[in-house]
Design a protein with these regions (language model features):
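Extreme N-terminal leader/targeting segments of oxidoreductases
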Residues: 1-17, 35-36
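Mid-domain catalytic core of redox enzymes
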Residues: 2, 36, 247-371, 380-384
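Conserved flavin/dinucleotide-binding core of flavoenzymes
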Residues: 2-8, 57, 115-118, 341-449
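N-terminal Rossmann-like FAD-binding beta1-loop-alpha1 element of flavoenzymes
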Residues: 15-42
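Glycine-rich FAD pyrophosphate-binding loop
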Residues: 34-59
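Short beta-strand to alpha-helix junction loop
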Residues: 73-80, 155-159, 208-232, 368-373
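Mobile amphipathic helical/loop "lid" adjacent to a hydrophobic cofactor/ligand pocket
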Residues: 79-83, 87-198
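Helical element adjacent to the flavin cofactor pocket in flavoenzyme catalytic cores
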Residues: 200-252, 256-260, 269
């Protein structure tokens, strides 16, 4: 699929905009700014594009290189902005993503799988056909979903997901609520924000046909968007600096009335698309030279720096060719000594047969050391997936993978200071830390310029 050309400028006077950070949010903002006719310069400290959602090379059991991902990410059909951006930069979405109805079943087929029907019929039929659930379980979930819908998917701001689900049968919590909550918010139900959880349900399960579909990447995450977007940006005339860290951010004129200097280079505006910690560092650098807006900028930096985070780990493992899972994604039963929640058969997603990704979300489930984590996860997968020959290749741990989406978390706003903005999945918004949240944040800030 050929890359779409940049449309004509939406502004009569293009601006010079610096985007600091080449993850999904920064790339989304850069593409949108170029489409609007602005001159974009993009910096990325690492030697790869994509931030936490990027390609990674590991060695298989024979010592041969394999391209995987820094962490196994799931997209869903409701990720409309991400899908549109992929198409803009030339990604063949239909070939690059495997679309499946929502499937949270384990290796024995127990749990929920939705049919390919429009809502609410998909949920109603999926719940009615769920294996391993009693009719009491099914009625309880349908009744609770109807209650959430009557409440317009709103709840008390301080409520957790556990509060929303109080009284539901344990089987439903184990087979549906917990896997969905951990995969979407990366927190157990007792800690996760009820408000955000209901928003995710509304915008995926109840938004329209296909919104809850799983979209599993058949290629590495770098090719899926950020690396491909970098090539598109270069073709459109943007300036990209890979492997270069921004050290200095200074205002031009009193309180940046004339813009900013990024490492001595003048720009009309700056967009911080880094991690929250790095954005806080740059904001403090900027605040030191501000006057009337200094305290506001320092306050923003304090919020960004104080955000609590949770970890995600991925154990890549391989079993003899010919071994595999009944579906590309299978739920695992987690608990003490069994930390993983999902297994992905990468052999069904464009990778070599027998390659598995075992995902451990929610930091409470992570053992203290990586060796114990890998051993426990491997033993769990061998037993629950009936793969005794499974051997570990590499364990990847992102200690600050996502901000902790608790009911009372204070997320910083997108506006930092005059002509200085921030974007990322941690910035104030209705969604948890997801790829779509990052992309939408980048697009919204680009529009603000």
């Amino acid at each position: 699929m050929a890359a779409a050309p940049a449309p004509h400028s939406l502004h009569t006077a293009p601006r010079r905009i610096a985007v600091v950070g080449g993850g999904w949010a920064g790339m989304a903002a850069a593409v949108s700014l170029v489409q609007r006719g602005h001159q974009v310069s993009l910096w990325e400290t690492a030697r790869h594009w994509g931030g936490r959602a990027r390609a990674l090379v590991v060695q298989d059991l024979q010592g041969q290189p394999l391209t995987v991902d820094n962490g196994q990410h799931i997209l869903i059909g409701a990720y409309t902005d991400s899908l549109a951006l992929m198409r803009t930069v030339g990604v063949d979405v239909e070939q690059s993503l495997l679309r499946l109805p929502l499937d949270l079943r384990d290796a024995h087929g127990h749990g929920l799988q939705l049919p390919d029907l429009p809502p609410p019929w998909d949920a109603a039929l999926g719940i009615a056909r769920a294996r391993g659930w009693s009719w009491r379980d099914k009625y309880a979930l349908l009744a609770r979903a109807a209650h959430w819908k009557r409440s317009h998917f709103r709840c008390n701001a301080h409520a957790t997901v556990a509060d929303l689900c109080q009284g539901l049968p344990q089987r439903l919590l184990q087979d549906f609520i917990d896997p969905l909550c951990i995969s979407a918010l990366n927190l157990p139900a007792a800690q996760a924000s009820g408000v955000v959880f209901l928003r995710v349900l509304h915008d995926s399960l109840f938004a329209g046909r296909g919104g809850s579909n799983l979209l599993l990447a058949r290629t590495d995450l770098g090719t899926l968007f950020p690396t491909t977007a970098a090539r598109w940006l270069i073709a459109q005339g943007a300036t990209l600096h890979l492997g270069q860290r921004v050290h200095s951010l200074q205002p031009r004129g009193r309180d940046a009335q004339s813009g900013w200097q990024v490492d001595g280079e003048a720009f009309d505006g700056v967009l911080l698309a880094t991690t929250s910690a790095e954005a806080a560092r740059l904001a403090l650098t900027a605040a030191s030279a501000l006057h009337d807006t200094r305290s506001a900028c320092e306050h923003w930096a304090g919020l960004a720096d104080a955000l609590p985070h949770t970890a995600i780990a991925t154990v890549y493992a391989q079993c003899p060719a010919g071994s595999g899972l009944p579906a590309p994604m299978v739920a695992l039963r987690s608990g003490p000594g069994a930390p993983a929640q999902f297994a992905f058969d990468r052999g069904q997603l464009g990778g070599p047969a027998g390659l598995m990704a075992l995902v451990i979300s929610a930091s409470d489930a992570l053992p203290v050391d990586r060796v114990t984590l890998q051993a426990q996860t491997l033993a769990q997968a061998r037993q629950q997936l009936a793969l005794p020959g499974l051997e570990a290749l590499r364990t990847v741990v992102e200690k600050r993978a996502t901000f902790a989406c608790t009911p009372d978390v204070q997320r910083p706003a997108a506006h930092v200071a005059p002509l200085l903005w921030a974007c990322g999945d941690y910035v104030e918004g209705p969604y948890p830390a997801t790829l779509e949240g990052a992309v939408r944040s980048g697009l919204e800030v680009a529009q603000a310029f």
